[in-house]
Amino acid sequence: MSASTALPVRDRLRIAIQKSGRLTEPARRLLTACGLSWRQSRDKLFCYGESLPVDLLLVRDDDIPGLIAQGVCDLGIVGRNELDEQAASRRRNGLPVPYQTLRGLHFGQCRLMLAVPEEWEWQDISQLTGKRIATSYPAILADWLQTHHIAAQIVELSGSVEIAPRLGTADLICDLVSSGATLAAHQLKPVIQIMESQAVLAGMICQPADARAGLLAMLLRRIDGMVNLRDSNLLMFRAFQEHLDALTRLLPDADPLVQLPDDGSGTLRVQTMCHGTITWQRLEELERAGAQGLMVLTVERSLA
């Protein structure tokens, strides 16, 4: 690695998150649940790590990929849409993409969609030829149009994309959609999904080799312990041996059953991790199949 591309030597890890927006609070909750705490500076943009040498930078979400690329931050929590847009832009300009997605975080889900005025009779993508498409994601859209061999004009806007067709500056839009309420309010309807997005943990492709390496490995393990347990519960019950096969068939989203030491009651003590919703109906089905003393326990964190 040349000196110009080498990562700066530091003994503290830096994470960038959105200063204010829909990903801010979920990102802070995740990091706090991983055991991190901070002392906030006067300007409220830099938070000094207290529990661990892991500092937090509060910035605009579209600055996060660049801060990682420049080595200013080691990690960033950002929407996949923003990360992919800047990566696509760099590739289209012949620049390397020095960062990567390390983990999907399963919050901030949305979709990048093509949406047309409600009065359109939509049939297929051939209708896009020659049309003007307003978007804040020109590089992703350009790649998609190129892949589908569609010649259309991209109208780049930094915001308020939904109003472009009503203003006459575009025929349709390509924008993020969560519930679809904003589209409906502007008499638009989604027709094609370009990509799915969620919050991701991004980092350099070239990982640090100094004191930050151990911190990074530890933090990734903790994040895995939080994210992988999302919507998971520990299920415990008693059952006779002859009922275990039937009970296992009722738990397709569970880990293999673990039998605990016999306490002399004549029934087996069993536990498993379920990775889906355990409703009252499921518990009643398990009870009818032979499970006794059913308990559902919330699991906050785990090291696998």
From Swiss-Prot:
The lineage of its organism: Bacteria, Pseudomonadati, Pseudomonadota, Gammaproteobacteria, Lysobacterales. It comes from Xylella fastidiosa (strain Temecula1 / ATCC 700964). This is ATP phosphoribosyltransferase. Pathway: Amino-acid biosynthesis; L-histidine biosynthesis; L-histidine from 5-phospho-alpha-D-ribose 1-diphosphate: step 1/9. Feedback inhibited by histidine. GO terms for biological process: L-histidine biosynthetic process. Belongs to the ATP phosphoribosyltransferase family. Long subfamily. It catalyses: 1-(5-phospho-beta-D-ribosyl)-ATP + diphosphate = 5-phospho-alpha-D-ribose 1-diphosphate + ATP. SUPFAM superfamilies: Periplasmic binding protein-like II. Catalyzes the condensation of ATP and 5-phosphoribose 1-diphosphate to form N'-(5'-phosphoribosyl)-ATP (PR-ATP). Has a crucial role in the pathway because the rate of histidine biosynthesis seems to be controlled primarily by regulation of HisG enzymatic activity. Its cofactor is Mg(2+). GO terms for molecular function: ATP binding; ATP phosphoribosyltransferase activity; magnesium ion binding. Its main location: cytoplasm. The gene is hisG. It comes from the Bacteria. Pfam families: HisG, HisG_C. The keyword ATP-binding applies. GO terms for cellular component: cytoplasm. Its EC number is 2.4.2.17. It is found in: Cytoplasm.
